[in-house]
Amino acid sequence: SVTGKIARQQCQGELQLPLSDCGVVALDYRGEKGIATALGHAPQAALANPEAGSVLAVSEALTNLVWAPLAEGMDSISLSANWMWPCRAQEGEDARLYKAVKALSDFCCELQINVPTGKDSLSMTQKYPNGEKIISPGTVIVSAGGEVSDVKKVVSPVLVNDEKSTIYHIDFSFDKLRLGGSAFAQSLNKVGDDVPTVQNPEYFRDA
């Protein structure tokens, strides 16, 4: 912690594994308030369905961020969207990017969360002297940030071996258990076409 204000870094637990859902920085050396930030992305899902990829990227960023006690709940959060899309190299990618941006905009409007900033990189292609061309998958990286009321109350992702404790699975999506764009599909060298998404944004915000 170079500045002395780092309240939550990437490594957690006795083994210092990089498990943190979010990063948290204190605003000063004596107070309890701070700023939390978290990331979300779903490039595999976006290959099959650009709209679902955008929704999943926002969802991941938000579900990573909520482990910090946000001062005003979801109203504390602002997002940044970094669009990395091979529009100049691949036919049809302009249309896919439009669908992805619109889906992210619509989803954030329903969640009542603003996206005041972002950036774009629209080449995302590497060309070689022999004519070979490598095209990156269209991806949006969503950064979520918000004010934290108490940096000492950030929930850790480290599990404790306690028989009296319980692990819960909470369904935020109200969707079917789809495998498109999943790690399982990737392990089979596939992408899939049946991609999960969030069916009820209002419930997602409440949860």
Outline where the language-model segments fall.
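Glycine/proline-enriched, intrinsically flexible loops and inter-domain linkers
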Residues: 1-207
